[in-house]
Amino acid sequence: MSDILDKIITVKREEIAAALESAPLEELKVQASARDSRDFVGALRDKHAAGHAAVIAEVKKASPSKGVLRKHFVPADIARSYAQHGAACLSVLTDERFFQGSARYLEQARAACALPVLRKDFIVDAYQVLEARAMGADAILLIAAALDTPLMIDLEAYAHSLGLAVLVEVHNRGELDEALKLKTPLVGINNRNLRTFETTIDTTLGMLDAIPDDRIVVTESGILSRADVERMEAAGVHTFLVGEAFMRAENPGAELARMFF
């Protein structure tokens, strides 16, 4: 299979160049300064303190590998359902070309509930970090496979200066070594290889011994059943980012509760 990640990054750079023309930095800074902030990391820790799994529930219409996951897609309704059934935070896809996401979806989901929201996208430039704050995100995703370490460190520092939490995502030990140079406590292990889109939850289990105890491990992708959840919890993983299993269910929030609570 061709390298999907490289294709996505190329498109992102084209999108940034176009966005700079339509929404200059100064305009975004004004929008960003008007946004309130919700404590993303704190919401996860509160769930842990209460003895519960911390679920980052994803609002995702489609993916490159699976196509459309949910035809009746109303972000506000999905967000409310997640909040009512015990989610700690939301993750909203804002990539349009590959995941049929939108900044509007993030705004709609955040307005519908009180949960902190992660902007799920392929961030390669500081402009996108500011853009995330302007659209109302409380956290951003930094993907180690898409960034060199100095840039990742710079983007994290900029995000923190704007009041954004950072989830750094890795898929292998080499990426983990670089990700641990960041300050964020949130380390996501993506069970899906972004270059091939092959998925196995053994990816998370095989990397746990290399992660310091002061980091919060977030297992991402491939968590599709209660059995998957129990396997992770038995290994000491209590923070999950889940999208597909919920999106395919008739009631996303009820499926969250069934799998986790």
UniProtKB/Swiss-Prot annotation:
Keywords tagged on the record: Amino-acid biosynthesis, Aromatic amino acid biosynthesis, Decarboxylase, Lyase, Tryptophan biosynthesis
GO biological process, one term: L-tryptophan biosynthetic process
Catalysis performed (reactions): 1-(2-carboxyphenylamino)-1-deoxy-D-ribulose 5-phosphate + H(+) = (1S,2R)-1-C-(indol-3-yl)glycerol 3-phosphate + CO2 + H2O
Lyase keyword on record: yes
Pfam families per the UniProt record, alphabetical: IGPS
Entry EC number(s): 4.1.1.48
Matches recorded under PROSITE patterns: IGPS
GO molecular-function terms, A-Z: indole-3-glycerol-phosphate synthase activity; phosphoribosylanthranilate isomerase activity
Primary enzyme class: lyase
Cysteines joined through disulfide linkages: none
Pathway(s) the chain acts in: Amino-acid biosynthesis; L-tryptophan biosynthesis; L-tryptophan from chorismate: step 4/5
Family listed: Belongs to the TrpC family.
Name of the protein in question: Indole-3-glycerol phosphate synthase
